[in-house]
């Protein structure tokens, strides 16, 4: 079957942050220095080749950009300064936009103004909705933060959280299914038995909760920052979805609040660290920043900061009116972050990375089995 090339693929990837792709002349230094570059995944060199040749379909089914954690060594060793690490990052953004069936990711990654406008619109609608509920339908009072007569009842907010969570899960689930189809499902040369999916399923929680592959890059600090950010966000999400009553209780529930404070500090600290790194540009993986990186980090700082402020206003200073106002402002950041960033932008990486580790192991196993079968039959390997 003929392979179609897209001559404008490099130009398209430039909208997602790719730089200096044409400088690459495939010396192989990047793949040689990468600790994860091994058969059948020889990156970044092979991915760079797909891009330069305009092999869009091969790039779409390629998991290698997700197997890269951008330690920066490939860019440091590149004699042509072709920035292979940053190109792999741009490929992840491009792949995210292709997995997304709605086209929202593509819009966001190609136009930071569109993403910012969407965030502001959702924030304003969220604020108006919560205020309308509190003043008109909730039956509470702005001067009451928790308990009987609360301006925003925990039960109503909890229902809203679950509805939003189900919508997000649906969008992200469909996009993850598309990721499977592009990388594994439509490849007729791969034969993956159902039992293999079950046998390798442990990779999903292992890589999600430990980010162990990043730790193997040899740079412990970036891994620790990344892990702290991911665990802090996951902890906060679990608290909001399952322990909101304890978080908003009139009495102090230290088990819930302890985890909440730790998660908030983790989000705030890691976000500020990443912002500082992108401003100073001292580390290789911080030298280049896409607009969506800035929006993502600023939104995280906003959400974490307002989360701490509304809790302090209520718990420490007993200023219920101020706490309610700040809580509405806080939700104006939370809803866009969950509703837009999780399924369509940066946060989607939390799902795609462990899935890529899972799918890549299934791919590698199937490829090895196929090669054994072909060798036994004495036939040439498929292209």
Briefly describe each language-model feature range.
Residues 91, 117-132, 158-177, 225-245, ...:
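Hydrophobic cores of alpha-helical transmembrane segments in multi-pass integral membrane proteins
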Residues 14-20, 61, 153-156, 214-224, ...:
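Membrane-interfacial loop-to-transmembrane-helix junctions in polytopic alpha-helical membrane proteins
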Residues 21, 38, 48-245, 249:
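Iron-sulfur-cluster electron-transfer modules
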Residues 1-2, 92, 96, 383:
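Flexible metal-binding regulatory segments at protein termini and peripheral loops
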Residues 29, 33, 73, 77, ...:
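Hydrophobic alpha-helical transmembrane segments of multi-pass small-molecule transporters/permeases
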Residues 194-209, 302, 361-383:
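Cytosolic juxtamembrane regulatory segments of multi-pass membrane proteins
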Residues 1-65, 350, 358, 364-365, ...:
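Ferredoxin-type iron-sulfur electron-transfer modules and their immediate structural context
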Residues 23-26, 60-63, 67-70, 261-264, ...:
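Secondary-structure capping and boundary motifs in well-ordered enzyme cores
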């Amino acid at each position: 079957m003929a392979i179609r090339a897209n001559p404008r693929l490099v130009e398209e990837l430039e909208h997602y942050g790719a730089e200096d792709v044409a400088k690459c002349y495939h010396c192989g230094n990047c793949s040689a220095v990468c600790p994860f570059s091994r058969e059948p995944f020889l990156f970044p060199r092979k991915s760079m080749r797909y891009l330069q040749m305009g092999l869009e379909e091969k790039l779409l089914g390629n998991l290698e950009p997700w197997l890269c954690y951008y330690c920066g060594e490939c860019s440091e060793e590149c004699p042509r300064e072709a920035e292979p690490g940053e190109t792999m990052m741009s490929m992840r953004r491009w792949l995210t936009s292709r997995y997304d069936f709605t086209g929202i990711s593509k819009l966001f990654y190609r136009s930071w103004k569109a993403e910012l406008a969407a965030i502001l619109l959702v924030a304003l609608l969220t604020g108006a909705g919560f205020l309308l509920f509190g003043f008109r339908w909730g039956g509470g009072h702005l001067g009451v933060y928790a308990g009987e007569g609360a301006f925003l009842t925990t039960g109503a907010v909890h229902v809203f959280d679950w509805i939003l969570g189900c919508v997000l899960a649906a969008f992200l689930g469909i996009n993850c299914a598309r990721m499977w189809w592009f990388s594994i499902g439509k490849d007729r040369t791969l034969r993956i038995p159902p039992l293999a999916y079950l046998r390798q399923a442990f990779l999903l929680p292992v890589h999600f909760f430990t980010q162990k592959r990043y730790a193997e890059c040899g740079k412990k600090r970036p891994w620790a920052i990344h892990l702290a950010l991911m665990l802090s966000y996951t902890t906060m999400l679990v608290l909001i979805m399952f322990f909101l009553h304890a978080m908003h209780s009139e009495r102090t529930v230290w088990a819930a609040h302890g985890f909440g404070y730790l998660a908030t500090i983790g989000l705030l600290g890691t976000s500020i660290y990443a912002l500082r790194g992108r401003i100073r540009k001292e580390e290789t993986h911080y030298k280049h920043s896409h607009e969506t990186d800035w929006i993502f980090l600023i939104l995280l700082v906003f959400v974490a900061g307002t989360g701490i402020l509304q809790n302090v206003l209520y718990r420490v200073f007993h200023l219920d009116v101020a706490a309610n106002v700040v809580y509405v402002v806080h939700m104006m950041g939370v809803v866009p972050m969950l509703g837009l960033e999780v399924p369509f932008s940066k946060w989607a990486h939390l799902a795609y990375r462990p899935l890529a580790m899972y799918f890549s192991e299934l791919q590698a196993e199937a490829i090895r089995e196929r090669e054994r079968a072909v060798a036994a039959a004495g036939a040439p390997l498929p292209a």
